[in-house]
Amino acid sequence: MSWRPPAHNAEGQEGLWYRSVCQSHGAFCGCGDFVGHLNRLAERLGRPQPPRPPGGPPGPAIRVLPALPPAEGSPRRHNRTENQPCGGGDADFGDQRDAGDGGAAADDLSPADVEDLLDWLDAPDRLSKTPVNNPPLTSPVPVESLVQYKLSTRSTSTRASRSTDGTSDVASLGRQLLKECKQNQQMLSFLQQVQNAQEQRSPWPLQETPYLPGRENAKPGKTRPRKKPRAKQKPKKRRRYRSSSNSSSKSNDSSDAESSTCSSN
């Protein structure tokens, strides 16, 4: 929806604005004196600056920090001013265009600068060819050149060969691989011997337990101890008495009893 001009005139707009400001003040403060409250704030805080009109002057310029001095041993660069384009002015630009014809552009780089630039280009190769201190230095030593700085920051080792940091020689890798292969071969042969020994060994015969009735519900581990079998005892010999004397005595007693009864009658 596009913007439309207000329906009230200037006096009506001021009245609406004043009432809206009073109502907004009453929404957060109950003093009831909007004008006095505003005057007290103006005395304490001062009048704020009005908003910057559109298209006005820009803000404060950003301060440019000066460039750091070049490190020792680094290639020297061509000094130029802040507003000067790269490669110098128009005359320098013309000299650079005529450098192929032997112009004055050759004076921009001195032989020392060219030598330093070539040293920087050969830095990766030089890093891999730098020997390692053996034994390592323990006392601090002042750094005098770039090569010495690289030599001091590189991790020391005792290997005799020269290689980049974090790599090993091909010969040492081959020896390590051969050692691992031998260990794997020994382990494989040992496992095969154990497997063959288990196959040749005869299994133990299983002993069948006799079936006993009434032991289906017996709890394991709580069996009654078996009693020892008793030795067979020989039967005792009984004494035999004579039956004839006993029978004769019994008959005599009975006859005496009968005779006594008859006499009494």
From Swiss-Prot:
Region: Disordered, residue numbers: 44-110, 152-171, 194-265
Database matches in InterPro entries: DUF755 (IPR008474), HEV_TT_vir_Orf2/Gyrovir_Vp2_N (IPR004118)
Entry keyword Transmembrane helix: no
Keywords from the named record: Phosphoprotein
Regions of compositional bias (Pro residues) in chain numbering: 48-60
Compositionally biased residues, Basic residues: 221-242
Domain of life: Viruses
Compositionally biased spans, kind Low complexity: 152-168, 243-265
Post-translational modification note: Phosphorylated at C-terminal serines.
Pfam families (alphabetical): DUF755, TT_ORF2-like
Record-given protein name: Probable protein VP2
